[in-house]
């Protein structure tokens, strides 16, 4: 057979090989993109009075399990849920803490000691006085602040067994500084327990 003909056949075969190979690569990548897009799940809602957005790489919808975890945090720490553990402690309906609240309060008191009170969960009366909490206020005087400070301070409370002991019944707790971040941790823990490692959890700006 003529060498020129053989050369042309070889070129055509090579071009066909390239075209088929390229088509297979494109199709494979397209399938991967489509598969990746269908494997992302998004859950949204509200907790602690603020929106949350959770996205994770899984076809398994974990929203129900996440809601259970967030509800537990809400029932322990929410200032805006009158049935929460912290709300009942603030209103002196009870002095008994559930394990979750006790654990977080113990950690909070440790941080308060290390920061010399820069972080303090007993600021609820001040927060309310300034209108940033669950009560509204138009203005606050220095005299009011001085009066409130008489029962604000981490040294005004202590943990005795499963109970919270207050030196003054007007002392109230506010976990707003850590509640959302703790909620993020609990939602993330649900995902990781189910083998999901690619995710983003955002609650009220905390991630």
Report the location of each language-model feature.
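FAD-binding core of FAD-dependent oxidoreductases
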Residues: 200-207
